[in-house]
Amino acid sequence: MLLLAIDTATSAIAVALHDGEHVLAESSTLDARRHGEYVAPGIVEVLARAGRTAADVSAVVAGTGPGPFTGLRVGLVTARTFAFARGIPVFGACSLDALAHQTWLQDAVELGQSFVVATDARRKEVYWARYDVTAGGVVRKGAPMVAKAEAIAEEVRGLPVIGRGAVLYAESFGARVGPLDVSAGALADLAARMLAAGQQLPDAEPMYLRRPDATPPPARKSALP
């Protein structure tokens, strides 16, 4: 298996190749406003570094967010287009879960510990979820949510916080540990483990949690009688 992973749910435009056991190559560019400019070059880069071609890729996994509308859409559309052109399956995986899995891979949290993943949702809000650490990995407790950082400060008090939200809203959260943005290598590793265990991955559908910031203008009333 050669798995192409793409995530654009955070400030990182992240791409990786995974052979089912190891990350072969990974690319990450930080730019919260220019996802569309970097994701395709990232794919070219990881294929070249791994000595592979697009024809070698057997499946694609895309981070489904939650994340800001425009950036998240770039990664998902790219993943679907690549998979369609190659006639291969495309899967989705929650980007918060990928960040949590990345934290576990880095041994940044301990067995039995609970922690929070919080990424930037703009408008002084975060996308967040709570996780427990088990011997086999991390387990999310409930669905991802979006909220003002200050509104969940009491609920998460005392818990380590992973993700860029911990930096942007440090006054609302506890100690920051682990990574800030999603690693496509961790996303690929999470997906590969789930597939190997016979678990069904979700479709590559975006998890927005709220309406986009940009909305179409209201229709003008006709001046004609």
Predicted regions and their residues:
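Generic secondary-structure signature for well-ordered alpha-helical cores
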Residues: A48, R52, R193-Q200, A214
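Short, basic and Ser/Thr-rich N-terminal targeting/leader segments
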Residues: A9-A12, K124, P202-D203
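Surface "functional belts" at beta-alpha junctions
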Residues: H22, R34, P89-S183, G198-L201, ...
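Short, flexible loop segments at boundaries between secondary-structure elements
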Residues: V182-L195
